[in-house]
UniProtKB/Swiss-Prot annotation:
One of its GO terms (molecular function) is protoheme IX farnesyltransferase activity. Its EC number is 2.5.1.141. Converts heme B (protoheme IX) to heme O by substitution of the vinyl group on carbon 2 of heme B porphyrin ring with a hydroxyethyl farnesyl side group. The gene is ctaB. This is Protoheme IX farnesyltransferase. It is a multi-pass membrane protein. The keyword Transferase applies. It comes from Bartonella quintana (strain Toulouse) (Rochalimaea quintana). One of its GO terms (cellular component) is plasma membrane. The chain crosses the membrane at residues 32-52, 53-73, 104-124, 125-145, 153-173, 180-200, 224-244, 245-265, 290-310. It catalyses: heme b + (2E,6E)-farnesyl diphosphate + H2O = Fe(II)-heme o + diphosphate. PROSITE patterns: UBIA.
Length: 311
C-alpha cells in the first residue's frame, strides 16, 4: 500500500515534493511520543527498584524510538485515509513529501532497533513488552480494529497504556500492581479522549470511512459512553492512593482533577444542541490532555519530593 503525490513543472514533467528533517520528525508523531515517553518515565522512576541513571536514559530512549517507529508505521498504513481527512491531509506521506516505501523502511528500522537495543542494554523482558506494544498498535489497532469497529480505540487503547509497564519492566525486569494501575488509568482515559475528539471531527472520520462511535452509534450514545468511561477512569486514578502507592498530595490533586473531568463529561452528556455539543466536546478533549499529564506529573513530583527531601 503506497501513496504518492507529485508536482509538475511547466513542461508537465513530474517533480516529487522535497522532504526535509522536519517531515521525518512529523512521521514520528512527536506529540504522541512525548506522552508515551513521559508516562514510561513515570513508570520507571516510581518502580520499587532503582535503576542506574545511564541505563534509565537508555531505556527511555528505546521506548521513544519504538514509539516513534510505531507512529511512522501507523502513518504509512493510514496514508490513504489521511489523504481524505482535513486534519491529516498535509502529513508527509499524503502530501507527497515522503514516499510510502521510505516511511515503511524508516518505521521498521526504528521499531526493530528499539527492541534490540532494549534487549541488549536493559533486559529482554522489557524488550519483549516493547515489541508486543508496537505489534499491538500496528497490527491489532491500526490494521485490524481501526477500520472495522467503533470499539477500535477501546481495545486498541491498550497500546498507548503499556509504556508505564515497559518503564517498570526496564527497571525491575518484571511488572507489578503499581505499573498495572498506571496502565489502567491510561486505558480508561483513552475512550473519553478520542470520542470527544471524534464528536467534533465526525465529518472527517465519516469521509474517511472510519467507524468512530458518533458515526456508528450516534451522538447521544457516544456522550453517554464518554461519561461512563470518565467515571471508570477516575476510579482507576484513585487506585495508587488506595493501595498506598501514592500519598495524600496525589490524592487531593487527582481528586480535584477527576471531579473537573467528570463535570466536563457530564456537561457534554447534557448538551442538547449541536453548538453546545461541539463546544463541550472540545473542552473535554483538551482537558483530557491536561488531565493525563497532570495525574502522572503529580505522581512523579510526589515521589521525587519523598525520595530526595523527606527520606
Amino acid at each position: 500500500m503506497f501513496v504518492s503525490r507529485e508536482l509538475s513543472d511547466a513542461s508537465g514533467k513530474s517533480i516529487p515534493p522535497k522532504s526535509g528533517i522536519y517531515d521525518y520528525i512529523t512521521l514520528l508523531k512527536p506529540r504522541v511520543m512525548s506522552l508515551v515517553v513521559f508516562t514510561a518515565l513515570v513508570g520507571l522512576v516510581v518502580s520499587p527498584v532503582s535503576i542506574n541513571p545511564w541505563y534509565g536514559f537508555l531505556a527511555i530512549l528505546c521506548i521513544a524510538i519504538g514509539g516513534g517507529g510505531a507512529g511512522v508505521l501507523n502513518m504509512w498504513y493510514d496514508a490513504d485515509i489521511d489523504a481524505v481527512m482535513k486534519r491529516t491531509k498535509n502529513r508527509p506521506i499524503p502530501s507527497g513529501k515522503i514516499s510510502s516505501r521510505k516511511a515503511f523502511v524508516f518505521g521498521m528500522v526504528l521499531s526493530m532497533l528499539s527492541v534490540l537495543m532494549m534487549g541488549k542494554f536493559i533486559n529482554w523482558f522489557a524488550a519483549l513488552l516493547l515489541a508486543f506494544t508496537i505489534f499491538f498498535y500496528i497490527v491489532i489497532y491500526t490494521i485490524w480494529l481501526k477500520r472495522r469497529t467503533p470499539q477500535n480505540i477501546v481495545i486498541g487503547g491498550a497500546a498507548g497504556a503499556f509504556p508505564p509497564m515497559i518503564g517498570c519492566a526496564a527497571a525491575t525486569g518484571t511488572v507489578n500492581i503499581e505499573s498495572f494501575l498506571l496502565f489502567l488509568i491510561i486505558f480508561m482515559w483513552t475512550p473519553p479522549h478520542f470520542w470527544s475528539l471524534s464528536l467534533f471531527s465526525s465529518l472527517d472520520y465519516g469521509a474517511a470511512g472510519i467507524p468512530m462511535m458518533p458515526n456508528v452509534r450516534g451522538e447521544r450514545s457516544t456522550k453517554k459512553q464518554i461519561l461512563f468511561y470518565t467515571i471508570l477512569m477516575t476510579i482507576s486514578a484513585a487506585g495508587p492512593f488506595i493501595i498506598d502507592f501514592a500519598g495524600i498530595f496525589y490524592a487531593i490533586f487527582s481528586t480535584i482533577l477527576s471531579v473537573i473531568f467528570i463535570y466536563f463529561a457530564y456537561r457534554l452528556w447534557k448538551a442538547d444542541t449541536y453548538d453546545a455539543t461541539i463546544l463541550m466536546a472540545k473542552k473535554t478533549f483538551f482537558f483530557s490532555l491536561f488531565y493525563l499529564a497532570a495525574i502522572f506529573g503529580i505522581l512523579l513530583i510526589e515521589f521525587l519530593v519523598w525520595y530526595f527531601i523527606i527520606l
